[in-house]
Amino acid sequence: MLNQTSRGPLQTVPTLEVKPMNPRIRTRLFLRLRALALLGLLAWPALADTIVHGDSGHPATRAEVLADLAAADFILLGETHDNPRHHQVRAELMRGLPPGVKTVVLEHLERGRRLDPARSLDDALERAGFDRKAWGWPLHQPVFVAARDMGANLLGGNLGRKDGRRVVMEGESALDADQARLLQQSPLSTTARGRLDESLSTGHCGHLPAARLPNMRLAQRARDAALARTLLESRDGPVVLLAGNGHVRRDYGVPVLLAGQAPGARVVNIGFMEVAPGERSEPAGMGDAYDFVWFTAPAQREDPCAGFSMP
C-alpha cells in the first residue's frame, strides 16, 4: 500500500493483517464497555447517526440492515414525520434493496388511492389526494422518488380520515366486518395495550381524557388494520411499508396483524428515533418493538404541546 506525504514522494508502508474478532469475545467486550459507560467510568459514544439491534442493543451496520431487509417478505420502515433525515436515510435504504419490490404502501394516502406512474410526482400526489400541508411536503420527496425509481407501485394504505373519526366517535360499531375480524384475531397483550395507551396519551400532550382512550386506541388499531390489509393484498414479492414509528412497532403495530394472517412471513422493521445531541444512554423498551433502531438528531421544531388542547 502506498502513502502520499507532504514531505516527499510516495513511500511504501507495510500492510498489517487484521483478523476479525471472535464473535463471543466481541459480545463480552461490548457488554463490559456498556457496563463501564453506565457506571460513568467510560464515555459512551453519542447515539446520533448510529444503528443498533433492537433485541440486544448491540451496534449494527448499514450492511447488516440491508442484508436483513433483502431477506424479508415485509419491510416496514418507520419515521418521525417531520424529520428530514429519516426520509433521506429511508431513501438510501430503498435504493440499496435488490430488485423484486413491486409495491410500496404509504401511510400518507388513503387505502384505495395510488400514484399514477405515468404522471409527474407532484401531479400524481395531487390526484391521489395527498395532503401536502398535513405531511409537510416536500419532506417525504426523497423516499417517494426512491420508491418510484425502483419501478414500484405506490399504494395508499391508511384508513380514510372520515372513517377514522367515525371510529373515535362510535367505537366498534364503526368498523367494517373485515376490520373487526382482523382485530379480533390479533388482540394486543396487556403489556402492549398499556404501551399503546401511553403513546396515545403522550401524543396528545397528556390531555387525552381516560373516557376517550378506548376509542382512540381502536382507531389507531383500525389504521394498522388498513395498512396490514393493503400489505397482504399486495404480496407479490417483497412489500415495503412507509409509516410512522408507532405503526411499524412489533408489539402493538402492523406486525401484530401480519403475524396473525401470514405467520410464516418474515417481517423486518426499523424504528427511526430522535436523540438529543450528545445523548449516550440507550432508550428502554426497544427490544420487542423493532429489529433495528436507527438514531438521528432531532428535527428543529417548536414545542408541539405549547398551547395544545383536545379538539
Q: In which residue ranges do the predicted regions lie?
A:
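N-terminal secretory signal peptides that target proteins for export/translocation
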Residues: 1-6, 10-29
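Bacterial N-terminal signal peptides
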Residues: 32-43
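N- or domain-start disorder-to-order transition segments that initiate the globular core
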Residues: 44-72
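Short hydrophobic beta-strand that contains or immediately precedes a catalytic carboxylate
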Residues: 75-78, 240-243
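Membrane-embedded segments
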Residues: 83-89, 111-116
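Short internal beta-strands
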Residues: 103-109, 269-272
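A substrate-binding/cap region within the structured catalytic cores of diverse enzymes
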Residues: 115-234
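C-terminal regions of proteins
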Residues: 226-232, 247-311
